[in-house]
Each structure stands twice: as structure tokens, then as C-alpha cells.
Amino acid sequence: SPTTIVAKAPIEGIEYPVVGILDTGIADNPYLSAWKTADSFTSYPDQYKDPSHGSFVSGIIEYGDELNGLSTTMLPGVHLFDAAVYPDSSKQTIYVDDLVEHIREAVERNRHIKVWNLSLGTSIESSLDDFSDFGMALDNIQDENNVLIIKSAGNCTNFTRQLPKSRIAQSADSVRSVVVGSLAHAKGPYDYAEVDAPSPFTRIGPGPGSIVKPDVVFYGGNAGMNAGKLEKTGI
């Protein structure tokens, strides 16, 4: 049965860390509004934004333990800095170079925020020999601004066609970023992964030059196929 989540809010007198959310924007809803910082950054006017993905990511950051039914964090919550660097793709085309510059501008203007989450990237597999321009740009942004980017390893759908997993996506080959892969924390009747094994959709290493990527893993759900239909657990 679906998990019922109770909206929470910051408690007066407690100091919470701030995480910058480099994404599509964060919606004003009862679960997230109280955690959003008063200031924000955007590369696009509201009519060219769709905050669905950014809100989904923010919800996992803010309510991860509650959604997973686990207790893995010491933090009761974090403030969310909304950095909308990616548009509604049905209304506006964006290229990697544009995205990099939006990320750079958001970070440079807000250097007081030291931890940033980036769950956007490309679907292009990284090279075994050469680092991508995207990955190197993320390294440069972190070096110049003394910040840390938490980066998703990337997802792939190869499991739906019984194909091997893709390796990490370009941008997840950033050396400086902490790249996060996904583990299954539960197993439904049609799911492919065993509990505590890599999620069927998560990408794997190594990175260029045999560097270890992803750096860490965390629970992100499970999936499988049933008569040609995608089945998901905990996503």
C-alpha cells in the first residue's frame, strides 16, 4: 500500500543545512514550501519551467527516510535552495553547454551554499579513456567555488530489453563530484534485483581511467517487467 507521508516543517531554534537543488525548479506544495529558502535562482521565466522533476528530487532529499521506511540520516531536514537550471523540455531546447553555464552561474552567485545536488545529466555513456567536457566542467566549477556536487550516476532502461547495464553517464565521470548509484531496498514479485543489490536501472562503473564511480550507493528502488509492462517498487 502507498506510504502516507506527513508534511513536516523546520522547528524554530534549530539550524538546518542548506542544499542547492540544481534541477527544474521546486513546486510550492505543503511538503516542500516550508523548507525552501527565501532566495532562489532561475535561468528561465516561470512559463518555461516544469518543476515536476525538481520537486520529485527535493521530496526524496527531504523525505527519503519516510518514503523508504528507514532511519538512515542524522538530519531531521534540510533547507532547499531552488536553482532552476533546466527548462520544460517541451517548450525550450537546452544543450549541454547551456546547462553547464546555468550551473556555473547558480553556484558562483551563491558560493555560501557548499553542497549542491545535480540529478540531471545526459544519456550518453562515458568513455573508458577520456573524461567528458561536462564532467570536467563540473570539476572546474567545484574547484573554483570550493563546493561539493552530489551527482546521480544516471539511469538506463536496458533491463527492459534484457541488455547489460550501461556504464555511468557523461557528467557522472566528474572526479570531484560524489556520484551516487542506486540499490534495491525491497523486491516485488516482478522485480529483477535482490534486496541490497544494484537497482536494475542504475548505471555502473568504472569511469575513465578505471576511476571508481559511482562513489557511493543508496536505496533508490527496484523494477522489472511483467508481460511487457514495467513494474516498479519504491520509486
Predicted regions and their residues:
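Acidic-leg catalytic submotif of subtilisin-like serine proteases
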Residues: 4-45, 60-61, 216
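Catalytic cores of nucleotide-enabled group-transfer and carboxylate-activating enzymes in metabolic
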Residues: 9-11, 56-59, 64-67, 73, ...
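Substrate-binding/access-modulating region of protease and related hydrolase catalytic domains
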Residues: 86-176
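Flexible, small-residue-rich helix->loop connector segments that border functional cores
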Residues: 22-29, 58-76, 104-109
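Extracellular S/T/G-rich loop segment that most often corresponds to the catalytic His/Ser-adjacent loop
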Residues: 17, 25, 31, 167-235
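Short helix-loop-beta-strand segments that form the rim/entrance of peptidase-like active sites
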Residues: 61, 68-91, 114-119
